[in-house]
């Protein structure tokens, strides 16, 4: 059995998690998820039904991680030999920029792709764009 099971859809943010899996040279099974027909194994691991999701088949038992940024941080922590994580002095910036990219930047890009434009500075603020 592979060390990880990776559930994703090519049109999701799963490519970010896939990159991280490759960076740590993880042994993983790649499972493509159809948006409308989510398999029971996937929903048992992640009842929210969101991709990407990984299952880490650790010696102490299976661990489920979802959300691209969380998967990247988890893999960096589990595979220190890959040197993806920060030093202690870099930790604050590492967390700030990781969550900024996963939050406001991602929301703004998605809104733009969906052709949604905030109509006022108040809407931009409420959406977390600024």
Regions flagged by a language model, labelled:
Residues 130:
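Aromatic-anchored helix/helix-loop segment that forms the rim or "lid"
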Residues 1-126:
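GST-like domain detector, emphasizing the conserved glutathione-binding G-site
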């Amino acid at each position: 059995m592979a060390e990880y099971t990776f559930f994703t859809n090519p049109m999701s943010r799963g490519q970010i998690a896939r990159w991280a899996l490759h960076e740590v040279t993880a042994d993983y099974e790649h499972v493509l998820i159809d948006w409308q027909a989510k398999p029971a194994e996937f929903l048992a691991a992640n009842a929210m039904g969101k991709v990407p999701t990984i299952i880490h088949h650790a010696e102490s038992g299976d661990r489920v991680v979802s959300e691209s940024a969380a998967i990247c941080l988890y893999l960096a922590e589990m595979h220190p030999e890959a040197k993806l994580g920060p030093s202690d002095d870099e930790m604050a910036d590492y967390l700030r920029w990781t969550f900024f990219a996963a939050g406001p930047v991602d929301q703004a890009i998605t809104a733009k792709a969906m052709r949604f434009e905030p109509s006022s500075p108040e809407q931009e603020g409420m959406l977390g764009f600024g």
